[in-house]
């Protein structure tokens, strides 16, 4: 917010995603449908990271992996925003995995796999980490980035931990358990698709 004010754009709202009510977003409500769409979008993003980063270092034609990503990214966007889109969330998850699983790569080549971990913004935002994935790939490595949805699971597990070890109320524990089960259920189509693939490991 401070950065927006300094840039002369104080009217732009900053929406805080938090479950403990520390910040209120006036005029903005998280409806169940919006929350579900947001989780679907995160799952799509996690799938793209898992699939694209796995095959791009081994592509036979430079740029072909990114082209496939762009094609399926638009399909994923349409599934969330276009009522006329006939593909369901589960079908898009399967389509992404199957497309990248069939993508032609150099099967004889194996590169060192390098994990990217750390603070959430730096881990996922190329501008914040100086395009680390591209740097690693240019240096002959295969980048591995943990799923963003696991960060939310980690946050929810904190509710269970605080109840069990720090004396927090049972409400936080119950909400955490419901949240974890809900995320697992929404994520299941992606997990199932990854389990059936040749190249990819499920979370």
Outline where the language-model segments fall.
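An N-terminal assembly and electron-transfer interface module characteristic of large anaerobic redox
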Residues: 1-203
